Swiss-Prot record:
InterPro entries: Rossmann-like_a/b/a_fold, Universal_stress_UspA, UspA. This is Universal stress protein Sll1388. Signal peptide: none annotated. Pfam families: Usp. Belongs to the universal stress protein A family.
C-alpha cells in the first residue's frame, strides 16, 4: 500500500525537523504529495470564558488576543512557506495550511478532508498523569484518524 498523500503535522519544536525529514524521505520513496500543516494551539474553552468572566473588559482583551493570533498566523505562514520551498527543492510536491485551535482535532479534520493516506507527526513523550492532564496530540490522532499514522520520537 502506497502513501500518495502524506499529511505532515508540525509544531515549532526541535523534533519537527526530524518529523519533516522522515516525511520528505517517505515522500521521495513513494512519490507522494505532502501537506505540511501547523496548528496554532488555542483551546476554544479557554477563549470562551473571557467574556463571561471579565465582562466589558473582555472586549479590549479579545482585541489583544485577536491581534496576537494574527501575528502568529503571519509568522506561521512565512515559516510554512519556507518549509514548502525546502521540500520542493528535495523533489517532493508540497503544499501547506495553518489553522488556529486544538491541534489534534484539526489534524483529524485535515486528514479526512484532504483524504490523506498517512499522517506523520512527533511525540513529546508525556507519560502517566502528564499525558492525562496535558493531553497528547499524537494519542488523539492515533485514535481519531482513519488513515495510517507515523509517530516520530526523540
Amino acid at each position: 500500500m502506497g502513501y500518495g498523500k502524506i499529511l505532515v503535522a508540525l509544531d515549532r519544536s526541535e523534533l519537527a525537523k526530524e518529523v519533516l525529514q522522515q516525511a520528505i524521505a517517505l515522500g521521495q520513496k513513494e512519490s507522494s504529495q505532502l501537506m505540511v500543516f501547523y496548528c496554532i494551539p488555542v483551546d476554544s474553552q479557554d477563549l470562551s470564558i473571557y467574556p463571561s468572566f471579565y465582562g466589558e473588559a473582555a472586549i479590549g482583551f479579545s482585541q489583544i488576543i485577536k491581534e496576537h493570533l494574527e501575528e502568529q498566523q503571519t509568522e506561521a505562514r512565512e515559516w510554512l512557506q519556507s518549509i514548502v520551498q525546502q521540500v520542493q527543492e528535495d523533489g517532493v510536491a508540497c503544499e501547506w495550511d495553518v489553522k488556529v485551535g486544538e491541534p489534534g482535532r484539526w489534524i483529524r479534520d485535515m486528514a479526512k478532508n484532504w483524504d490523506a493516506d498517512l499522517v506523520v507527526l512527533g511525540r513529546r513523550g508525556l507519560k502517566g498523569l502528564a499525558e492525562v492532564f496535558l493531553g497528547s496530540v499524537s494519542s488523539y490522532v492515533i485514535h481519531h484518524v482513519q488513515c495510517s499514522v507515523l509517530i516520530v520520537q526523540h
